[in-house]
Amino acid sequence: MERLSAAPVKGQTGPERPSPFSQLVYTNNDSYVIHHGDLRKIHKAASRGQAWKLERMMKKTTMDLNIRDAKKRTALYWACANGHAEVVTLLVDRKCQLDVLDGENRTILMKALQCQREACANILIDSGADPNIVDVYGNTAVHYAVNSENLSVVAKLLSCGADIEVKNKAGHTPLLLAIRKRSEEIVEFLLTKNANANAVDKFKCVHQQLLEYKQKISKNSQNSNPEGTSEGTPDEAAPLAERTPDTAESLVERTPDE
């Protein structure tokens, strides 16, 4: 088996548990030990980008492309998490299910965006993946795209009917999340798409206040005044949930070697 992250040793203190607030939007529950028995051959081949092996397996026998591993993940999930667009195309062309949910109600599209696999995400969107499913924290695919600061995917999702006003459990619409991320281009784009400029999160932070805060940071940055970036920041502007999806390196689950 392969250990994906160091587990606490008996007698030692493990990582500090996140507060309930930090769990409202995103979690980091993807670190675990994968046993050989957890994955079938189809999952291993998909995770490694072995399209040729999958095709050979499909020719030999009738396969259930949507069969899940012990944690409810399909071959398509594994291909997207590891960025194997060729395998994603193969599975989609063979009519596998697109909107299979994992244990946290995340779609495969969300996972592709969380792992910053844009090519895989685009294939899913073009193939009709539902952009409006919410995970257990209330996030849609648009929240994930905004958090990854991927303007092109945000635009693509909206063009395919994604809801621009969904609030996650922290009270963040995609617009508020973009402001929290200081993603100026995405903020401006969402406003051109008539995102609600009066959206309020659970701390009652009015959007206009956050915009002014962002503009102050931008102005201070241009003036090369690092101390000024924190001046005039309302306490309410602190986000309810501090945790965001980790980088792709820590999110991609690796499979055991054969």
Curated annotation (Swiss-Prot):
PROSITE patterns linked to this entry: ANK_REP_REGION, ANK_REPEAT
Record has Repeat as a keyword: yes
SUPFAM superfamilies to which the protein is assigned, alphabetical: Ankyrin repeat
Disulfide bonds: none
Chain positions of ANK repeats: 71-100, 104-133, 137-166, 170-199
Biased composition (Basic and acidic residues): 243-258
InterPro entries (alphabetical): Ankyrin_repeat_domain, Ankyrin_rpt, Ankyrin_rpt-contain_sf
Keyword line: ANK repeat, Repeat
Disordered: annotated span: 1-21, 216-258
Domain of life, source organism: Eukaryota
Polar residues bias locations: 218-232
Protein name per UniProt: Putative ankyrin repeat domain-containing protein 30B-like
